[in-house]
UniProtKB/Swiss-Prot annotation:
Record-stated family: Belongs to the AAA ATPase family.
GO CC field: cytoplasm; nucleus; proteasome regulatory particle, base subcomplex
UniProt organism field: Caenorhabditis elegans
Keyword tags: ATP-binding, Cytoplasm, Nucleotide-binding, Nucleus, Proteasome, Transcription, Transcription regulation
Gene that this sequence comes from: rpt-6
Protein name: 26S proteasome regulatory subunit 8
Disruption phenotype: RNAi-mediated knockdown at the L4 stage of larval development inhibits activity of the proteasome. RNAi-mediated knockdown at the L4 larval stage also results in increased mortality and transcription of immune genes containing the elt-2 binding motif when exposed to Gram-negative bacteria such as P.aeruginosa. RNAi-mediated knockdown at this stage, furthermore, prevents the recovery of P.aeruginosa infected animals treated with the antibiotic streptomycin.
Length: 416
């Protein structure tokens, strides 16, 4: 009888290989499963870390608010302070302060305040119990007054002002020269001019020249209209004038331009009504600020009006207004210069005679000459052209100067 076959020899040789593949497949599945779990756990950790950082930021913000509220609560628990005005410094640790309406006191200065920063007229806070000076306060300025300060300097230059060479020279001497070179006046031993009055018919370039001065002097420019200083309640206009000069002193050197000054600077007459009395109070405060007890060395005032005949003589006297500059209607040469300035950027046809156009507008102001250029461009636009001709200027002259110029126009041009 034959012996039984061996088990190793009778088994299928492919079975160990299949088992090995199964084990590898299971290992890959487990590796992929745990890798996914690890990625999910890392994502959760990242989210939690982000939440922790967000909560820490919120905690810091809340701690800041709590600290500010504690400081505010502590200030509310403290006694109130008196507001005073520094008269003068007595020594390194004491100053003379005027408290309204009680009087003047010599007070101690807190260690945290520099004695050199306490200038005459500065607003300060005094402790209610010891009258010690513990805080330097900013000057009180009405928001309406602070808005009068021109933040952006106008882009007008002297080259944009035509036919006013004499006026430009005079205003440079009075306004620009003292601001840029005050040492020249000190060397000569003469007082600097304080103010200048620009007067003349409407549209002759008074405001334009003031804008050019603001551009070239490179100092603080404050623009105010006279009608803005006429207020409803008693004393409001005078207070605004006072705060206007306070703000000008803070930002010195500065220039104050008062347009339409005749609205508050008219001559005083007897038997005026209540409204006129308030206007007169405003003018009296202006007179005091121009030539009062306090010096205004670094403040220059430019006033403009077209009614110099109704201004008060007290406003026009030397010491307040040191120079009066007249702006007459431009002559023929000045009108030609103004036409060249305003037509500089226009697309003109060749051969346009500006001198001939200037001859056709006798007595025109600078504003009317500028209007001629604008109307000439409108006539060209009406005919769908991108260039301006001599005929456009002649028709613009007829329209601006209100002449009967229909005979010079064709029916086609009138109704096209």
């Amino acid at each position: 009888m034959a012996p039984p076959a061996s088990t190793a020899s009778s088994a299928d040789p492919s079975k160990p290989t299949a088992q090995k593949l199964t084990e590898e497949s299971d290992e890959k599945t487990l590796r992929k499963y745990f890798s996914t779990k690890v990625d999910d756990a890392q994502q959760k950790v990242a989210d939690k870390s982000q939440n922790v950082r967000r909560l820490q930021a919120q905690r810091n913000e809340l701690n800041t608010k709590v600290r500010m509220l504690k400081e505010e609560l502590q200030q509310l628990h403290e006694q109130g302070s008196y507001v005073g005005e520094v008269s003068k410094a007595m020594d390194k640790k004491k100053v003379l302060v005027k408290v309204h309406p009680e009087g003047k006191y010599v007070v101690d200065v807190d260690k945290s305040i520099d004695i050199n920063s306490l200038n005459t007229g500065a607003r300060v806070a005094l402790r209610a119990d010891s009258y010690a000076l513990h805080k330097l306060l900013p000057n009180k300025v009405d928001p309406l007054v602070s808005l009068m300060m021109v933040e952006k300097v106008p882009d007008s230059t002297y080259e944009m002002v035509g036919g006013l060479d004499k006026q430009i020279k005079e205003i440079k001497e009075v306004i620009e020269l003292p601001v840029k070179h005050p040492e020249l006046f000190d060397a000569l031993g003469i007082a600097q001019p304080k103010g200048v009055l620009l007067f003349g018919p409407p549209g002759t370039g008074k405001t334009l020249l003031a804008r050019a001065v603001a551009h070239h002097t490179e100092c603080t420019f404050i623009r105010v209209s006279g009608s803005e200083l006429v207020q409803k309640f008693i004393g409001e206009g005078a207070r605004m004038v006072r705060e206007l000069f306070v703000m000008a002193r803070e930002h010195a050197p500065s220039i104050i331009f008062m347009d339409e000054i005749d609205s508050i600077g008219s001559s005083r007459v007897e038997g005026s009504s209540g409204g006129d009395s308030e206007v007169q109070r405003t003018m009296l405060e202006l007179l005091n600020q121009l030539d009062g007890f306090e010096a205004t060395k670094n403040i220059k005032v430019i006033m403009a009006t077209n009614r110099i005949d109704i201004l008060d003589p007290a406003l026009l006297r030397p010491g307040r207004i040191d120079r009066k500059i007249e702006f007459p209607a431009p002559d023929e040469k000045a009108r030609a210069d103004i036409l060249k300035i305003h037509s500089r950027k226009m697309n003109l046809m060749r051969g346009i005679n500006m001198a001939k156009i200037a001859e056709q507008i006798p007595g025109a102001s600078g504003a009317e000459v500028k209007s001629v250029c604008t109307e000439a461009g409108m006539f060209a636009l009406r005919e769908r052209r991108i260039h301006v001709t001599q005929e456009d200027f002649e028709m613009a002259v007829g329209k601006v100067m209100q002449k009967d110029s229909e005979k010079n126009m064709s029916i086609k041009k009138l109704w096209k």
